[in-house]
Amino acid sequence: MAPKAVLVGPPGAGKSTIGRRLAQALDLPLFDTDVAVEEEAGRTIAEIFVQEGEPAFRALEEEIVRKAIESHEGIVSLGGGSILSERTRELLKGHTVIYLEISVAEGLKRTGTNTARPLLAGGDPRQKYTELMRKRRPLYRQVASIRIRTDGRSPARVVQQLVAKLAE
């Protein structure tokens, strides 16, 4: 068993929204690792970061991603930072991985000052998002077999393009 597709991308790229719509369009189940982490921990991601720190969160996330990649047959939406894990990047090899690309400006517009996103909280949001993208963009590109820009495109249009690409 393997997922039909795995979505990756930075905060605000549309992983959850596109994931839901793509799963619906393909009549497949969706597995959102951020939701699964919160369900497993019984707390929000922000609470895990505050109470246990990023390393504890990443360890839990890595295990949930592993289970999803090994057993879920639908669409899997990964948390934005999951690709920081070398183990996760290894697990993604051989799978259809869709990188939802977004500009820093659009990402900031979509995420704003969302405190549910602990790595973007506090300080200068533009600087934090730019630095996050500087670190992660090469990793997203490394794991991606399909890249699609989401800037200025409706979720419906992005899903339409992805359905066509997945049918190729």
UniProtKB/Swiss-Prot annotation:
Enzyme group, top EC level? transferase
InterPro entries referenced in this protein's UniProt entry, alphabetically:
P-loop_NTPase (IPR027417), Shikimate/glucono_kinase (IPR031322), Shikimate_kinase/TSH1 (IPR000623), Shikimate_kinase_CS (IPR023000)
Signal sequence range: none
Q: What does the record give under GO molecular function?
A: ATP binding; magnesium ion binding; shikimate kinase activity
> Which keywords accompany this UniProt record?
Amino-acid biosynthesis, Aromatic amino acid biosynthesis, ATP-binding, Cytoplasm, Kinase, Magnesium, Metal-binding, Nucleotide-binding, Transferase
Q: Where does ATP bind?
A: 12-17, 117, 153
> SUPFAM superfamilies given for it?
P-loop containing nucleoside triphosphate hydrolases
Q: Where in the cell is it found?
A: Cytoplasm
Per its UniProt record, what PROSITE patterns does this chain match?
SHIKIMATE_KINASE
Q: What does the note accompanying the cofactor annotation read?
A: Binds 1 Mg(2+) ion per subunit.
User: Which Cys pairs does UniProt list as disulfide-bonded?
Assistant: none
Name the residues that bind Mg(2+): 16
The reactions it catalyses are: shikimate + ATP = 3-phosphoshikimate + ADP + H(+)
The main place the protein resides is cytoplasm
- Pathway the protein takes part in: Metabolic intermediate biosynthesis; chorismate biosynthesis; chorismate from D-erythrose 4-phosphate and phosphoenolpyruvate: step 5/7
Q: Which EC number(s) are documented for this chain?
A: 2.7.1.71
Question: Which family does the UniProt entry place this protein in?
Answer: Belongs to the shikimate kinase family.
Function text: Catalyzes the specific phosphorylation of the 3-hydroxyl group of shikimic acid using ATP as a cosubstrate.
Assembly and binders: Monomer.
Quote the HAMAP family the UniProt record gives: Shikimate_kinase
Q: What's the name of the protein?
A: Shikimate kinase
What gene is this protein translated from?
Answer: aroK
